[in-house]
Amino acid sequence: DDILFDFKEYVTSGVRLCDLKEVHFDAGNLPDYSDIHVQQLYLLRYAYAYSFEYKRMYASLIRRMNPGMEIAVTSIGCGSMIDYWALTRVVPNRCTIRYRGIDTIDWSYRMEQRPQDDVLFRNADAVELVSKAKRLTADAYIFPKSISEFSKSDIEEICLPSKAISPAAV
């Protein structure tokens, strides 16, 4: 709701909307996500569609993992944490989520945390952060719509076998 209100306020302030007409999120285009208006446009355009995809993904993952009372997820390139929001819709209410979101952009809008969850956002380079970790301890590692923004060598660095990522989590 805040996003729509904020964007409407921006639009009615007399700005040149032609600037946003040039913003594209497809075909390898990387818009300036640090611009709050690009964030608003992106979220208004894609948040619900992506959350539906993530809900399906997490539902499938949870069926395979059967996490019990807690699940730990690290989201690499989490943006506004839409994938966390989707995860909260799939796990039982009694299940606690330990969510670690990493993104190079400090998004102005983030999904609201449930009271029982342990949520931490890190505004950092994911490749650097993960490669410095001695051991990866989450149950699942997610690349929500961000995997195409990483080079092959970045992916290899993140997924080093010595970090002991379980096969169900990749």
Task: For each feature predicted by the language model, list its residue ranges.
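N-terminal auxiliary segments of SAM/dcSAM-dependent transferases
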Residues: D1-H24
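Class I SAM-dependent methyltransferase Rossmann-like catalytic core
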Residues: A27-M65
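Conserved class I S-adenosyl-L-methionine
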Residues: M69-G79
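Conserved SAM-binding motif I beta-strand of class I
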Residues: R98-D103
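S-adenosyl-L-methionine
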Residues: R110-R135
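A short SAM/SAH-binding and catalytic strip from SAM-dependent methyltransferases
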Residues: A138-D154
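Conserved beta-strand signature within the Rossmann-like core of class I S-adenosyl-L-methionine
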Residues: S166-V170
